Regions:
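Hydrophobic helical h-region of N-terminal Sec-dependent signal peptides
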Residues: 10-14
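C-terminal motif of bacterial Sec signal peptides marking the signal peptidase cleavage site
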Residues: 17-20
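Walker B catalytic acidic pair
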Residues: 163
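Bacterial N-terminal signal peptides that target proteins for export
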Residues: 1-9
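Fold-level signature of zinc-dependent metallopeptidase catalytic domains
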Residues: 36-52
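Bacterial Sec signal peptide processing site at the extreme N-terminus
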Residues: 22-35
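Post-HEXXH active-site segment of zinc metalloproteases
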Residues: 171-188
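Metzincin-family zinc-dependent endopeptidase catalytic domain
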Residues: 51-159, 167, 171
Length: 188
């Protein structure tokens, strides 16, 4: 029953994304280019990730990305640890994205899922800020997200769709109901 509710929420969220946001790149009107290509999404776990969380995430992803697959586990590199925290381990999301870029091909989107705390150094005037997810750039096809901050799988899946939107070329949207709205460092 819970998976069905998440699927309904995700379908509504995807409708919002597609209905209220625009790609950052021009859309072709050529009939030969209008064919919908469903990308292959390769999901890597970063560090230890609960099997139930992996399964729930993959079930929800497959609703929108039928070519989604678990691609393997990547050890959380010590080089990604921030030196700005002393109370617990936090990994720099930008460094994790650089690691994930090595697994990217032209025909895939690569996402990393972790249960570890992730963040960015020198983010919005703060020495270090914890975040829920980060795409490596608009349209780059690489993103990382963490279950550390989101409140439950529903919010985690929203973060996942938001970062996948960036990875596929979507920018932030001013509409507060849109999945691509900017959280501005908050927890929506």
């Amino acid at each position: 029953m819970n998976n069905r509710i998440f699927d309904i929420i995700l379908l509504c969220a995807l409708s919002l994304i597609l209905g209220s946001c625009k790609k950052s790149t021009p859309v072709s009107t050529s009939t030969t280019e209008q064919k919908s290509v469903v990308p292959v999404v390769c999901v890597y776990t970063l560090g230890a990730v609960n099997v139930d969380l992996q399964r729930a995430m993959m079930d929800s992803l497959r609703v929108h990305y039928p070519k989604c697959r678990m691609a393997g586990n990547i050890h959380l590199p010590d080089s990604a640890l921030t030196t700005k925290r002393n109370d617990h381990k936090r990994y720099r999301a930008d460094v994790l994205n650089k690691v994930l870029c090595h697994y990217k091909s032209d025909s895939t989107i690569v996402v990393g899922l972790t249960q570890a705390d992730i963040g960015l150094d020198n983010f919005r005037g703060r020495a270090h800020s914890g975040i829920m997810g980060l795409a490596s750039g608009i349209g780059t096809g690489v993103a990382v997200f963490s279950s550390y901050r989101p409140h439950g799988n529903g919010q985690l899946f929203s973060v996942m769709l938001h970062e996948l939107g960036h990875a596929q070329g979507l920018r932030h949207c001013p509409d507060i109901k849109c999945m691509m709205q900017n959280a501005k460092g908050g927890n929506p």
